[in-house]
Amino acid sequence: MSLGIVVNVSRQSAIDLARRLARWLDERKVDYVFESLSAEKTGSHRSAPIEELNTQCDAFISLGGDGTLLFTSQHSVTKPVIGVNVGRLGFLAEFSPEEMLPAVERFLNGDYSIHTRSQLEAGLLTNGSPEHFRALNDVVIEKGTYPRIPAFIIKLDGELLSSYRADGIIIATSTGSTAYSMSAGGPIIAPKSSVVVITPICPHMLTVRPIVISDEKSIEVSVDAPDGAFPLNCDGHLRKMLAPQEVVTIKKSSQSINLVANSSRDYCEVLRTKLLWGREA
C-alpha cells in the first residue's frame, strides 16, 4: 500500500499535521509520497509531481480544507481519498485532525467504506481540437470584466432551455450544491442524488430560478455578446477564457471520486453543524 499526500501549504497547521502523519507512517513502515510542493514545505525527501501521484499511489490523503480536497480530486481519478479538514467549513473533508491517525489505520486494515461522488466534464473545441475539464463541485461561466450584462444561452440535449441575462451561470453537482451554488440561492441537494442544478448568478430577471435536472442531460452553454472574453472555471480554477458564441458542453463525467467515509457522522448532522441550523441568532 502506498499513500499520496497533498497538503495545503498555506496553513502551518496542515504542514505540522503532515509531518506528524509522516512520522506515524515511518514508524509503521508504510510507503508514502508527498506532492512536490507539499514535500518541499514539510521537508520530506519523498516527492513526486501531482500529475504522477495517481500512478504511484493506491490512495490519497488530503490535508487542508475542501479546496485542497478538490485539488486532490483532479488527480486522484478513482483512487480513495481520505480528507482531513484543517480548513474552516469542511463539507467534503470528512475527518478532523484528531480523527486522522485512527482513520488512516482503519483504512490500512481494510476497515472503511466509500462515498462515491459523481463529477462533471466540461468539453469544448479549440482550433478543432477537443479540450476536457473535470469538476467535482461545479462548472462556472461568468462575465468576468465584461462591462455589460451578457446573455447566457443554455440548451438541454440540444433544446433551448432559456437565455439568462446574469453575471454568470453555475452548473453544480449534488456535491457542489452546498458551495457556490448555495451562495447564489441554489437548493441544497443530498449528495447521492443523480441530478445537477443550474443556478444563475445575480440574474437581471425577476422570475428566473435555479433549476434541477437529471445528470444524464447534456448541457450546452454559450455567451451571447458582441465581444469580450468570459472565464470558464472548474472547481474555482480558471480553465479557459471563452469567446462569444463559443459552446461549452457539460455532462456527467465517466470518472467518479471515491471519498473515504467517516462512519461517526451523517449528512444531516453535517448540515446542522456547518450551516448552524437550529441555532438562535
From Swiss-Prot:
Protein name in UniProt: NAD kinase
Gene3D superfamilies according to UniProt: Probable inorganic polyphosphate/atp-NAD kinase, domain 1 (3.40.50.10330), Probable inorganic polyphosphate/atp-NAD kinase, domain 2 (2.60.200.30)
Cited function: Involved in the regulation of the intracellular balance of NAD and NADP, and is a key enzyme in the biosynthesis of NADP. Catalyzes specifically the phosphorylation on 2'-hydroxyl of the adenosine moiety of NAD to yield NADP.
Source organism of this protein record: Chlorobium phaeovibrioides (strain DSM 265 / 1930) (Prosthecochloris vibrioformis (strain DSM 265))
Gene behind this protein: nadK
Chief site of localization: cytoplasm
Cofactors required: a divalent metal cation
A GO MF label: ATP binding
Pfam family, one: NAD_kinase
Transferase listed as a keyword: yes
Annotated family: Belongs to the NAD kinase family.
Listed GO biological process terms: NAD metabolic process; NADP biosynthetic process
Residues the entry annotates as binding NAD(+): 66-67, 137-138, 148, 165, 167, 178-183
Keywords for the protein's UniProt record, in alphabetical order: ATP-binding, Cytoplasm, Kinase, NAD, NADP, Nucleotide-binding, Transferase
EC number: 2.7.1.23
SUPFAM superfamilies: NAD kinase/diacylglycerol kinase-like
A single GO cellular-component term on record: cytoplasm
Compartment list: Cytoplasm
Active site positions: 66
Catalytic reactions on record: NAD(+) + ATP = ADP + NADP(+) + H(+)
InterPro entries: ATP-NAD_kinase_N, ATP-NAD_kinase_PpnK-typ_C, NAD/diacylglycerol_kinase_sf, NADK
Source lineage: Bacteria, Pseudomonadati, Chlorobiota, Chlorobiia, Chlorobiales
Keyword Transmembrane helix attributed: no
